[in-house]
Amino acid sequence: MTQIIPALDLIDGEVVRLVKGDYEQKKVYKYNPLEKFKEYEKAGAKELHLVDLTGAKDPSKRQLALIEKLAKEVNVNLQVGGGIRSKEEVKALLDCGVKRVVIGSMAIKDATLCLEILKEFGSEAIVLALDTILKEDYVVAVNAWQEASDKKLMEVLDFYSNKGLKHILCTDISKDGTMQGVNVRLYKLIHEIFPNICIQASGGVASLKDLENLKGICSGVIVGKALLDGVFSVEEGIRCLQNA
């Protein structure tokens, strides 16, 4: 069944939202991250998603103490991403109690290391974040979305699916933080070609209709801004996915 996955982005312990990954376009929310995650858990969320934007910019400043506190205090699965660049960082996060670690640019820039991580920690512990942008074809963006690679999305998926990959987080970066709706066509395409891969959709979720459109296509839908801005609640999202 498709799950709603509430998300928080954190900079120095503060809940924020960026538009299209731009640190200059930052909105700060006056929420305590632990209280917010507890609220989402109480509402029925079975998984939570956290982006460590401080650690993404500077791995030496990764918010490990806070992440460990969050992982221990919530009773549902927590997945964490944000500029993971090494095997040591993956291990540190898993040791903190994180259920899954999200890996992004490394999948494109260092496939050997990425495959080592998949093998060492197992496919259930790793999510590949494949942030895409539509050129003549869907290509994967790297370096916090600052540049498009020459790698086509479907070729990357083909490569990793043959190496045991189970979970991906796919963001259409033209949609992220814009509340313009999700790219259903993109997720349908991935699901048709790679039915055994669990897809987490991200970017642009603006209404319950978006959730409805993704039911049965994606294993999860990551929702950040729409929940923080009160467009709909976790309870409404769960009901929508159960009834659609």
Curated annotation (Swiss-Prot):
Compartments (UniProt record): Cytoplasm
GO molecular-function term, one example from the UniProt record: 1-(5-phosphoribosyl)-5-[(5-phosphoribosylamino)methylideneamino]imidazole-4-carboxamide isomerase activity
Major subcellular location class: cytoplasm
Pfam families named in the record: His_biosynth
Keyword line: Amino-acid biosynthesis, Cytoplasm, Histidine biosynthesis, Isomerase
Active site per the UniProt annotation: D9, D131
TM segment ranges: none
Catalyzed reaction equations: 1-(5-phospho-beta-D-ribosyl)-5-[(5-phospho-beta-D-ribosylamino)methylideneamino]imidazole-4-carboxamide = 5-[(5-phospho-1-deoxy-D-ribulos-1-ylimino)methylamino]-1-(5-phospho-beta-D-ribosyl)imidazole-4-carboxamide
S-adenosyl-L-methionine found in the keyword field: no
Keyword set includes Isomerase: yes
Secretion signal, residue range per the UniProt entry: none
Pathway noted in the entry: Amino-acid biosynthesis; L-histidine biosynthesis; L-histidine from 5-phospho-alpha-D-ribose 1-diphosphate: step 4/9
GO cellular component, one term: cytoplasm
Entry EC number(s): 5.3.1.16
Any GO BP annotation: L-tryptophan biosynthetic process
Classification via InterPro entries: Aldolase_TIM (IPR013785), His_biosynth (IPR006062), HisA_bact_arch (IPR006063), Isoase_HisA-like (IPR044524), Isoase_HisA-like_bact (IPR023016), RibuloseP-bd_barrel (IPR011060)
Top EC category: isomerase
HAMAP family named in the record: HisA
Sequence similarity: Belongs to the HisA/HisF family.
Classification via NCBIfam families: 1-(5-phosphoribosyl)-5-[(5-phosphoribosylamino)methylideneamino]imidazole-4-carboxamide isomerase
Protein name as it appears in the record: 1-(5-phosphoribosyl)-5-[(5-phosphoribosylamino)methylideneamino] imidazole-4-carboxamide isomerase
Gene giving rise to this polypeptide: hisA
